[in-house]
Structures are given as C-alpha cells and as structure tokens.
Amino acid sequence: MTNIRKTHPLIKIVNHTFIDLPAPSNISAWWNFGSLLGLCLAIQILTGLFLAMHYTSDTMTAFSSVTHICRDVNYGWLIRYMHANGASMFFICLFLHVGRGLYYGSYTYFETWNIGVILLFVVMATAFMGYVLPWGQMSFWGATVITNLLSAIPYIGTTLVEWIWGGFSVDKATLTRFFAFHFVLPFIIAALVMVHLLFLHETGSNNPSGLISDSDKIPFHPYYTIKDILGVLLLILALMTLVLFSPDLLGDPDNYTPANPLSTPPHIKPEWYFLFAYAILRSIPNKLGGVLALVFSILILMLFPLLHLSKQRSMMFRPLSQCMFWILVADLFTLTWIGGQPVEYPFITIGQLASVLYFTIILLILPTVSLIENKLLKW
C-alpha cells in the first residue's frame, strides 16, 4: 500500500513542501528566517483577528476601544502587545531574510526575489495602516504626513490624496478604509507567500557556497524541521521577553495621547522599521525628489540581479564585496538613527551623506568591486 502522504492530492503538496523536499546539506541558520516569517505572519493574523473582535474603526471610539482591549478584555493587553511587538519581530526577520539573500546571491532566482520585494512593499503598507488604527497623536500625524507625500505626484497628486482620505483631511473615512485594508492585506500576503514558495521550489534553495548542490541533498524532515523549531523557540522567547518586560520599548509615547488635529507633535516619526526610508525621504529638500528616493530605496532591490557582475554567486569567497556589504549594513543603521532625530544640524548633513552612500554602494561600488574580484580570480 502506498503512503497517503505521497498520494493524497492535498497532503502530497504539504509533503513536497515540508517533508520530502530535497534541501542542500549545508544551509546555515541564515536560512531559518523564511519559516520564522511564516510564524510571524501566523501570529499577526491570529492576534489581529482577536483584536478586530473588540476594535471599533470610528474616530470617536477607536482610541477608547484600544484602551478597553488593554484594560477590560481577558488577556487583551497580551494580545495587543503581541500584535504590536510581533510587527517589530516581523520586520527584524524580514530585514535579516533580505540581507541573507543579498549576501549569498539568492536574488539570482528572479521570480522568487521579485515576489519577495513585492511582499516587502505589501508588508510595509500593511504595517503603516496598522499604526494608524489606535488613533493616537503619532497615528494621526503619521497618516497625515505619509499620505500627503502622494500630493507630490504631478497633476493627479492632490486629487489622489483626497481620494485616499475620503475627504479633505485624515478623518473617519480614512480610519475606516485603513482598518478594512489592514484586515484584508495579511491574507493577500499569505497568498503571495504561497507564490513565493512555489517559485522557490521550482529551483530549490540556494546555499552559503553559492554552488549547485543537486548532488548533495537531504530531506527537509527531520533535519530542517528540527532546525526550524530551534529558531521558532528563540523567536518566541525574544517576542515574549519584549512583550512581558518592556512592551512599549519600540513604541512612541505620543501614541498614548488621543489624536488631536489642532496640536502637532514636535517630532513626527514613523515606527523604527521605517526610519531608514524616512531618513532618505527627508534628506532631499524637494518633495517629489524625496518621494521618488523613498520608493527607489526599496525598489532598488529589484535591480540586484541586473547589477550582479561577479563570476561567483555568493559573497562567501569575495572579501572585498563582504567589506562593502557590511559598510552598507552600517549605513542602514546610521539612516535608522538619523530618521529618529530632529531635522537640524548636524543630523541633516549626516542623513544626506548616508543616503548618497546607500545608493552609491548599491549602484556603483558593489558592481565595480565585483569586476575587480573577477580580475583577481585570474592571478
């Protein structure tokens, strides 16, 4: 009798994805973040579902409903803070996952990579809309500032912004539609994840050496299921430590003040995971230029397959590229720090230099260094 695992139409798909999947024998802990992102998405959808049962998307009651969740709902505080800090964990895993892809040349799987970049955009949009829902000061002003950026689009800008707002300012209509989109987008993300995996399993996983590993594959289960469980335990440990000991560490105190259109906070800034892009946006004095730089700072990821001029796929044996990669990482940390600082000297200058360095490393220095390394191979 044949195993149901290998014959049943539905179970067969699960089998080919998580059990009998041939995986390279040498993939490191950097390959754990895909499964961790899946876990983060599951946590966010579950906690979000329970929050949506008690939340009201009305400007008069939104802030009070979040307070009610934290004070009166059974373990509401836990659900709310798991959702808020779960978003931070989601982005930490996302950045590490993308960084792994850049370092080991995983972007040469074009379809998988491009779906991944689209996923990054959709997750960022979802997180932005979620930040607006508690209707605190930073929610309101963050929504006002970021949606207003679209007015920089020539000719249709102003109409587009008013269309998104559903009026002449961020108000009840905006909050309601943001809630609707914030609810539905995670399910679209889940569908995109399926497509992401579909394309990945067409080619098989990359590995740290960047070499073809068809001759040395091992089954996903039990080797990588056990390895993933370790990652899962560490992620849950980190998340619950944050939630139970310092739930407001990554939040903004201004968001504990109800939204007031008549009082602008002294420093409007997004959540920490958007600060690097926000710093790039602010480093350009022109509004349209800033918006284009903001979009391109993420969209540039799609150019990596075209900018790959090295004869080797991975950076494992390319010390010059490694050096530039870690300078790029340091530059992103600098941009994140600058994004949270007020717009004044010397932060403006540092932000502009860091922004120029970001684009220069990706568009110019990394490809040039790759060509130099190709020459060194002949010595």
From Swiss-Prot:
Chain positions recorded as heme b b566 binding sites: H97, H196
Residues that bind heme b b562: H83, H182
Other information: Heme 1 (or BL or b562) is low-potential and absorbs at about 562 nm, and heme 2 (or BH or b566) is high-potential and absorbs at about 566 nm.
Positions bound to a ubiquinone: H201
Cell compartment(s), UniProt: Mitochondrion inner membrane
Protein known as: Cytochrome b
Task of the protein: Component of the ubiquinol-cytochrome c reductase complex (complex III or cytochrome b-c1 complex) that is part of the mitochondrial respiratory chain. The b-c1 complex mediates electron transfer from ubiquinol to cytochrome c. Contributes to the generation of a proton gradient across the mitochondrial membrane that is then used for ATP synthesis.
Gene this protein is translated from: MT-CYB
Keywords annotated in UniProt: Electron transport, Heme, Iron, Membrane, Metal-binding, Mitochondrion, Mitochondrion inner membrane, Respiratory chain, Transmembrane, Transmembrane helix, Transport, Ubiquinone
Lineage, uppermost ranks: Eukaryota, Metazoa, Chordata, Craniata, Vertebrata
BP terms from Gene Ontology: mitochondrial electron transport, ubiquinol to cytochrome c
Transmembrane segments: 33-53, 77-98, 113-133, 178-198, 226-246, 288-308, 320-340, 347-367
Source organism, top-level taxon: Eukaryota
Annotated signal peptide: none
GO MF: metal ion binding; ubiquinol-cytochrome-c reductase activity
Principal subcellular localization: mitochondrion
